[in-house]
């Protein structure tokens, strides 16, 4: 077991991949709890698709793909916030419209450019094993910035989630809190997309948080548990993919393996809590 854990870390690319997925797991766990509290799961889906045209345009002009993703991702949440403040427009409808429009623009851009197929595959499924030092530093900066931002306004965000009327009565700027959370969610999704791809990035945010909600009702505990599950689940997933490929000649997609591990943890937690609830109910009846 010791060799199974340590052996992959001897390869430089695996060390970078493990650090990347641990950072993303920590970030996703912290942000994901607030996403679940505010029921913003669909927002993560919208963001992961609205960054598509930004990445495509950046590729077409030879610019940084991260910059393109940041511009369109943050622009989408700002536009969404502006639309949501209009009472005549339903928030879900606004997200659906942005989802369709940004994705369509991305498809149009891609259809006009050649040589994008390989990068499109990486965009969809990620390249966690190809993470370089620069990307690792960028992810670390995003993770630290987002976690610090959440920590500063954690109490306000929790109050906003459970009692928006009370938060407004106490003078908290709800619009600014919503905007801050939306931007943090966008940054977390964008950071995950580069390593995990648009298909899998959201799982790093939603799955650990959903698991933590099964295990505790306290928001602070949920954030700690979700961050731990995200980081360890990512590490274990990469180790399993490495071991299967190197020692058993079975090729497993690293990003997908990470998601499978996180989902297995969620399933185990769901079963365990269900059994525990039934046992306690029977004891109460007896």
Q: Model-found features: residue ranges?
A:
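Membrane-interfacial amphipathic/re-entrant helices at transmembrane-helix boundaries
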Residues: 1-26, 285
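Transmembrane helix-bundle core of multi-pass membrane transporters
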Residues: 4-14, 87, 91-155, 183
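Cytosolic-side transmembrane-helix boundaries in multi-pass membrane proteins
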Residues: 6, 244, 251-286
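Hydrophobic alpha-helical transmembrane segments
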Residues: 14-23, 39-48, 66-71, 81-97, 136-141, 171-177, ...
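Alpha-helical transmembrane segments in multi-pass membrane proteins
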Residues: 20-29, 50, 54, 58, ...
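Helix-loop-helix "hairpin" substructures at the membrane interface of multi-pass membrane proteins
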Residues: 24, 136-208
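Short loop segments and helix-boundary regions at transmembrane helix junctions
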Residues: 33-116, 212-227, 240, 244-251, ...
């Amino acid at each position: 077991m010791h060799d199974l854990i340590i052996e992959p870390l001897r390869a430089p690319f695996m060390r970078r991949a493990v650090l990347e997925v641990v950072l993303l797991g920590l970030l996703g766990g912290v942000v994901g709890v607030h996403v679940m509290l505010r029921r913003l799961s669909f927002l993560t889906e919208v963001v992961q698709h609205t960054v598509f045209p930004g990445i495509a345009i950046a590729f077409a002009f030879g610019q940084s793909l991260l910059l393109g993703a940041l511009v369109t991702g943050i622009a989408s949440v700002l536009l969404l916030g502006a639309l949501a403040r209009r009472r005549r427009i339903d928030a879900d409808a606004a997200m659906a419209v942005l989802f369709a429009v940004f994705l369509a623009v991305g498809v149009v851009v891609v259809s006009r450019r050649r040589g994008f197929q390989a990068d499109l595959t990486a965009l969809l499924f990620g390249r966690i094993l190809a993470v370089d030092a620069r990307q690792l530093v960028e992810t670390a900066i995003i993770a630290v910035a987002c976690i610090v931002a959440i920590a500063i306004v954690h109490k306000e965000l929790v109050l906003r989630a459970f009692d928006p009327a009370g938060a407004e009565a106490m003078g908290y700027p709800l619009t600014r809190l919503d905007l801050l959370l939306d931007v943090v969610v966008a940054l977390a999704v964008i950071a995950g997309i580069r390593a995990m791809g648009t298909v899998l990035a959201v799982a790093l945010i939603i799955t650990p948080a959903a698991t933590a909600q099964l295990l505790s009702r306290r928001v602070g505990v949920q954030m700690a548990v979700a961050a731990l599950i995200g980081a360890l689940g990512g590490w274990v997933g990469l180790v399993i993919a490495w071991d299967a490929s190197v020692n058993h000649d079975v090729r497993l997609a690293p990003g997908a393996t990470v998601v499978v591990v996180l989902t297995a943890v969620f399933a185990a937690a769901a079963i365990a809590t269900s059994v525990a609830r039934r046992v306690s109910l029977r004891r109460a009846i007896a």
